[in-house]
């Protein structure tokens, strides 16, 4: 973890100069309970969590010293947990509006866009419409949408169409990461 050892020697020795985070989950924005959970989940490597926003996290990493360049997407899962929690239900219009505001804040703090990891719960509880709304909020500041899609097997084409729908309806570029098609 860069929070424990910012030298990132394993990456630097392999020529990695940029580390990008936020593929579905990001280190902000955090509620108090999300922050407490992040602290309680630490294993042998422990670190302080003095931040609540994505921008504060990035500032914290840089202030501690880091060898690589760092950047982050804001996690669609993170903003969903922030407002909806871990329950399997659609976001209410009010929750969705707050989620969009969290994306806008993260974009103002330097996020590259929105990242989703739809193969895992609670990310897979998000509807296509929810993801369009979040991607659209990121697009207001030039952000993009990246996704580990809902399905990599028999539903691959449907999942790919969903990503294309999200990007086209939001008016943003998109990227599939962890594409595993055979």
What do the PLM-derived regions correspond to, one by one?
Residues 56-57, 90-116, 122-182:
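Histidine/acidic residue-rich metal-binding segments in metalloenzymes
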Residues 3-113:
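Divalent-metal coordination cores built from histidine and acidic residues
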Residues 1-2, 148:
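Histidine-centered divalent metal-coordination motifs
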């Amino acid at each position: 973890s860069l929070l424990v050892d910012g030298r990132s020697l394993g990456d630097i020795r392999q020529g990695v100069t940029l580390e990008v985070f936020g593929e579905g989950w990001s280190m902000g924005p955090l509620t108090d309970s999300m922050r407490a959970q992040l602290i309680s989940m630490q294993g042998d490597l422990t670190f302080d969590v003095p931040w609540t926003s994505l921008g504060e996290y990035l500032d914290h990493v840089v202030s501690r010293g880091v060898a690589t360049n760092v950047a982050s997407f804001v996690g669609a899962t993170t903003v969903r947990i922030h407002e909806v929690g871990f329950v399997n239900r659609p976001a209410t219009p009010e929750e969705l509006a707050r989620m969009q505001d969290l994306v806008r804040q993260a974009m103002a703090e330097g996020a590259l866009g929105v990242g989703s990891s739809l193969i895992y719960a609670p990310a897979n509880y998000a509807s296509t419409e929810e993801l369009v709304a979040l991607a659209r909020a990121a697009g207001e500041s030039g952000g993009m949408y990246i996704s580990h899609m809902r399905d990599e097997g028999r539903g691959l084409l449907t999942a790919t169409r969903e990503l294309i729908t999200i990007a086209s309806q939001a008016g943003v570029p998109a990227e599939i990461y962890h594409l595993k098609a055979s």
